[in-house]
């Protein structure tokens, strides 16, 4: 993917404790993405960290990464996966907006620089108020309900397999009322059919 010549202005919500922000409402795919990190315990290993990038319009998880340390590399791996899945040709008709919290990893100089290189506009939630990233937070809760809370993982391999299987199921088969009962992949297919018919 060619990245030369791409630039973007970095935008953030002001970090004020009393400030509230409503969640942006996307009107098409690749307009608003959300990213976030969670962790869960693996016996004999410790905490395992998960970072995801999700398209708010299609509800598709575009990228995810697992690691033993909550480093910026983990966030970048999920981000690069998302770009490769959503924009395999390396081009977009307009910029993507990426919503995150104010954590040290997504606000690091390294992460911000990569976003600028990819022409992705970074927006952060207001201080101590994750409402702006509500769709991403909602997915993380679904992940915990479906994968983390019902299970006790005994190894990294077991945890990784469960995560991989869930994301495959979620994207291909998990129905959403906001998508007219379709899964993210099926909804994307319907969008493609509509665009083809209109061409």
Language-model features: locations:
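Charged DNA-binding/catalytic regions of mobile-element recombinases
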Residues: 1-199
């Amino acid at each position: 993917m060619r990245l030369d010549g791409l630039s973007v202005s970095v935008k953030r919500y002001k970090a004020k404790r009393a400030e509230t922000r409503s969640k942006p409402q996307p009107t098409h795919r690749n307009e608003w993405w959300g990213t976030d990190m969670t962790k869960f315990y693996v016996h004999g290993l410790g905490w395992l960290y998960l970072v995801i990038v999700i398209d708010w319009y299609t509800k598709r998880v575009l990228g995810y990464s697992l690691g033993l340390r909550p480093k910026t590399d983990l966030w970048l791996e999920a981000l690069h996966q998302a770009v490769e899945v959503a924009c395999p040709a390396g081009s977009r008709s307009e910029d993507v907006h990426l919503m995150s919290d104010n954590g040290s990893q997504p606000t690091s100089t390294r992460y911000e620089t990569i976003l600028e290189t990819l022409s992705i506009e970074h927006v952060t939630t207001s201080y101590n108020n994750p409402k702006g990233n509500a769709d991403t937070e909602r997915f993380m809760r679904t992940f915990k309900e479906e994968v983390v809370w019902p299970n006790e993982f005994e190894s990294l391999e077991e945890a990784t397999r469960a995560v991989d299987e869930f994301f495959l199921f979620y994207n291909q088969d998990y129905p959403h009322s906001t998508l007219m009962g379709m899964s993210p992949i099926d909804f994307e297919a319907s969008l493609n059919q509509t665009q083809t018919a209109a061409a």
